[in-house]
Regions:
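Non-catalytic alpha-helical scaffolds and adjoining flexible linkers that form interface surfaces
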Residues: 1-208
């Protein structure tokens, strides 16, 4: 953990506080101390110059959700370059996105499953269900109740295969987005109980 001194100071080039918002990417040089649990920043600066995310309430709401999901679910301390690259790229993609913003949190959750180890394990075929227990698409309705419907399974497939720049082409209305988010959270919850502690889901459902 690192401590930032003078975060609210208005001296110099402005307050550092503006850099520490949900999902803002920063680069920093730190000073580690063997005598203290909290290390210190020597220098901190913006890693990605964000053009729209700080000013768009839809994007900032999604960023809050992304930050909480990662905080709740990612507990590893060792470096994970693939996960870092995905998150870094996701922030840049969200900032650059003009259309399809309302689908972005769904795309993020679907593709984050790849990095967390429970991406669907086989190919999708039209009309398939998704068996949450097995983590795979199936042409037959599972006998247990832990599954995604054929509609939700198709959306999961579309989100996994879609380039983030084209997520507007996945046509979902508000009711469908709410229902699919609930379904995706059930899938996550089967693998990671901590997803149920994410509070920003309610805000997402109000905005989208």
């Amino acid at each position: 953990s690192y401590m930032v001194q003078g975060v609210r100071s208005a001296r110099g080039h402005g307050s550092k506080l503006a850099l520490f918002q949900p999902m803002f990417a920063v680069e920093f040089e730190g000073l580690e101390s063997s005598r203290m649990q909290m290390h210190r920043f020597r220098e901190v600066r913006s890693g990605i110059v964000l053009q729209s995310l700080p000013f768009d309430v839809r994007k900032s709401t999604i960023a809050l959700f992304m930050a909480e999901v990662l905080y709740r679910l990612v507990k590893e301390c060792e470096p994970n370059q693939r996960l870092f690259d995905f998150v870094w790229g996701s922030v840049a993609a969200l900032d650059a996105l003009d259309e399809g913003v309302a689908n972005f949190h769904l795309w993020f959750l679907a593709n984050l499953s790849r990095l967390l180890g429970f991406r669907p394990g086989n190919d999708y075929t039209p009309g398939a269900w998704f068996d949450i227990r097995e983590g795979s698409f199936t042409p037959l309705r599972p006998s247990h109740g832990e599954m995604l419907s054929t509609d939700d399974a198709r959306i999961l497939h579309d989100l996994l295969e879609c380039d983030v720049r084209y997520i507007a082409e996945i046509g979902l209305n508000r009711r469908q987005r709410v229902a699919y988010l609930d379904a995706l959270l059930v899938y996550y919850g089967y693998h990671l109980d901590a997803i149920h502690a994410v509070q920003s889901v309610r805000i997402l459902q109000e905005v989208f």
